[in-house]
Amino acid sequence: MEASRRWPYAAWFMAVLGLVAVFSSSEAYVFYAGGRDGWVVDPAESFNYWAERNRFQVNDTIVFLHDDEVGGSVLQVTEGDFDTCSTGNPVQRLEDVAAGRSVFRFDRSGPFFFISGDEDRCQKGQKLYIIVMAVRPTKPSEAPEPAGAAGPVSSKSWSWQAFPPAGATTPPPLPPSWGSAPEHAQAPGKSSLGGSGGGEMSRSSSLGAPPPTSGAAGLAGVVASVVVGVLGALLMF
């Protein structure tokens, strides 16, 4: 009789732990192409160099901030069209979710290529390629990877393995307006958008989103500790 009373508590406990696990493993991050300078022509820092300093995973999102009045459209293209700045047959033309804001969500691992919708602007450096890493489950007993395994891609002659996203689902639709930049990334000011974007832009301003913080994981640990304590107290009676 006593054991049958404990079953509902055990089931409730397992359900909560499942929710905590999902919460702690479903984080996705937002990156602004080019950092605070935005999607500009002739950037002070190459967009590809900016991408090498960041780590992209499946379900992350990249935002292209541009000035509509100077042809700041964004195209996803093949590698061949990326090399030649060909805009005639894009894989996808990114739609604006708000004025001057084009958004793309990475739904798989592997390479992605983006160029300006204006071929002349693409030739001046408004182009970007990104290598997206697959989401891999954490294994406590797994041996550490070699020192250079997770380093940045040094050139377009990369070597990578494409892993299907583990349990990845289609993310919810984006809101009609992207109201504000996330806490870990700053949107560029109006003065840094459009124009030539030449030598006046400092390299230090081309910062991407910093590495993810451990706030969600810490919260998950607190929740799990509280649940264990409550369950232990209930089983004492």
Curated annotation (Swiss-Prot):
Intrachain S-S bonds: 85-122
Entry keywords, A to Z: Disulfide bond, Glycoprotein, GPI-anchor, Lipoprotein, Membrane, Signal, Vacuole
InterPro entries: Cupredoxin, ENL_dom, Phytocyanin-like, Phytocyanin_dom
Chain residue ranges for the region called Disordered: 139-215
Tissues expressed in: Expressed ubiquitously. Accumulates particularly in reproductive tissues, especially in maturing seeds.
GO MF terms held by the record: electron transfer activity
Intracellular or extracellular location(s): Vacuole, Aleurone grain membrane
Glycosylation sites: 59
CC terms in the record's Gene Ontology section: aleurone grain membrane; plasma membrane; side of membrane; vacuole
Main location: membrane
Domain of life of the native organism: Eukaryota
UniProt xrefs under CDD domains: OsENODL1_like
Signal peptide: 1-28
Prosequence residues removed at maturation: 207-237
Keyword Transmembrane: no
PANTHER family: BLUE COPPER PROTEIN (PTHR33021), EARLY NODULIN-LIKE PROTEIN 1 (PTHR33021:SF435)
Name the record gives this protein: Early nodulin-like protein 1
Organism: Oryza sativa subsp. japonica (Rice)
